[in-house]
């Protein structure tokens, strides 16, 4: 569409179209003080945003090996940002979270659900 002889743009100039694209490659953003509180027992209920994650196993072979920091979390997906932005489905992967001094493997099916709803779930201990 043209207005006053000029072409309209779909988005603001200089801004990326995909969420998280502007922080790709900037790992320093995710250094937080909350990491010490995450343990093997409470990671299912804990906030995942900001944690370093790596896909260990997946039903789709291209997902294996993706690593980065968790940028966003929805009901069925995790958005990982490393050298680029990846949207990873939770229910088909096994994810390893790196907490600095320990690595925790979690089946993605245990993470399915909105973060606030996972708190209400009862898990067998």
UniProtKB/Swiss-Prot annotation:
Catalytically driven reaction(s): Endonucleolytic cleavage of RNA, removing 5'-extranucleotides from tRNA precursor
GO cellular component: cytoplasm; ribonuclease P complex
Compartment annotation: Cytoplasm
Listed Pfam families: RNase_P-MRP_p29
Annotated source species: Thermococcus kodakarensis (strain ATCC BAA-918 / JCM 12380 / KOD1) (Pyrococcus kodakaraensis (strain KOD1))
UniProt keyword terms in alphabetical order: Cytoplasm, Endonuclease, Hydrolase, Nuclease, tRNA processing
Recorded GO MF terms: ribonuclease P activity; RNA binding
Assembly behavior: Consists of a catalytic RNA component and at least 4-5 protein subunits.
Main location: cytoplasm
InterPro entries referenced in this protein's UniProt entry, alphabetically: RNase_P/MRP_Rpp29_sf (IPR036980), RNP1 (IPR023538), Rof/RNase_P-like (IPR023534), Rpp29/RNP1 (IPR002730)
Biological process per Gene Ontology, one example term: tRNA 5'-leader removal
Protein purpose: Part of ribonuclease P, a protein complex that generates mature tRNA molecules by cleaving their 5'-ends.
Entry EC number(s): 3.1.26.5
Region feature (Disordered): 1-22
Family: Belongs to the eukaryotic/archaeal RNase P protein component 1 family.
Protein name: Ribonuclease P protein component 1
């Amino acid at each position: 569409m043209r207005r006053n002889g000029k072409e309209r743009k779909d988005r603001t100039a200089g801004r990326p179209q995909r969420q998280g694209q502007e922080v790709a490659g900037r790992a320093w953003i995710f250094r937080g003080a909350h990491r010490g509180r995450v343990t093997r027992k409470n990671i299912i209920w804990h906030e995942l945003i900001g944690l370093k994650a790596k896909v260990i196993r997946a039903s789709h072979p291209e997902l294996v090996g993706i690593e980065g920091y968790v940028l966003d979390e929805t009901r069925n997906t995790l958005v990982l940002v490393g050298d680029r932005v990846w949207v990873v489905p939770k229910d088909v992967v096994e994810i390893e979270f790196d907490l600095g001094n320990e690595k925790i493997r979690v089946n993605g099916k245990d993470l399915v659900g909105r973060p606030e709803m996972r708190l209400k779930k009862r898990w067998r201990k």
